[in-house]
């Protein structure tokens, strides 16, 4: 069974990842920096790709401070960036998604486990 673990920087929220001007939507500078960080992490660590297999994803958000935040606001940026880095073909493959908040850490971050999904 394939499984990979990623240690990534703190992700932008969906509100700061996507911006719009008129009818045009685009990824913010902060979003682009996060995408590049994920891409380089995958490349530098020679992470194996999942292709089109069904996936189970577990995400641990390590906040930068004790200020409460919506836990689900960062999930889309993480999944989109993993997809764009080539870890999987499309985030529609995610069959199970688990998101956890940890204690705050200086600078923040997130840990992601991606594995093949096997229904019970």
List PLM regions with ranges.
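Acidic, proline/glycine-enriched N-terminal capping motif
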Residues: 1-120
């Amino acid at each position: 069974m394939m499984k990979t673990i990623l240690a990534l920087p703190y992700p932008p929220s969906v509100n700061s990842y996507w911006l719009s001007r008129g009818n045009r939507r685009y990824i913010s500078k902060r979003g682009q920096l996060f995408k590049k960080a994920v891409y380089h992490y995958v490349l530098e660590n020679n992470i194996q790709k999942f292709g089109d297999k069904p996936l189970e994803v577990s995400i641990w958000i390590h906040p930068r401070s004790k200020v409460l935040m919506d836990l689900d606001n960062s999930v889309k940026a993480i999944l989109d960036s993993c997809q764009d880095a080539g870890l999987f073909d499309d985030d529609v493959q995610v069959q199970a998604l688990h998101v956890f908040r940890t204690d705050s850490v200086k600078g923040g971050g997130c840990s992601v486990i991606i594995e093949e999904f096997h229904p019970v």
